[in-house]
Amino acid sequence: MPEFAEPVTPGENDSGITRRHLPHLARAGATYFVTARLRAKPLTPAEVGFVKGQILAGDARYYDLIAIQIMPDHFHALLRPRPGFSLRRVMKGIKGVSARRLNHHRRSKGRLWQDESYDRIVRDQQELEEKIKYMFLNPVTVGLTTEPESYVGWYVK
């Protein structure tokens, strides 16, 4: 099981709250649970693997990835942006690169992801473990598989 870096107390090292439709708290060194939803047609199993590969490609360069679960209509990620990269910049990169490459693969154009993502700062080891369990079981919950460890969209360090 991945280990949480250190407990987070609300207010410590906050660098601001931004708001569009959802509030987004930025905190240096924080671990985030993020959900991004598709605006386009659902991903095929092969495309799920493709998007997973795009997210894995940024690990250790732009963010430290703890876990991801790519579903046909959304993805969840547990990650910590690397120094010099905000969560906003990381998500823009993940969604932008995956959209361009998937649109090229599909021979289509347009936005793949909804503009805004949901994010939450993970506060402690217990919450980290709860989020990993939720992500792991997500494909079982929606009926995509009975064996979550073999689902193509799953990755955990």
Where are these regions (language model features)?
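Short catalytic/metal-binding and nucleic-acid-binding patches
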Residues: 1-157
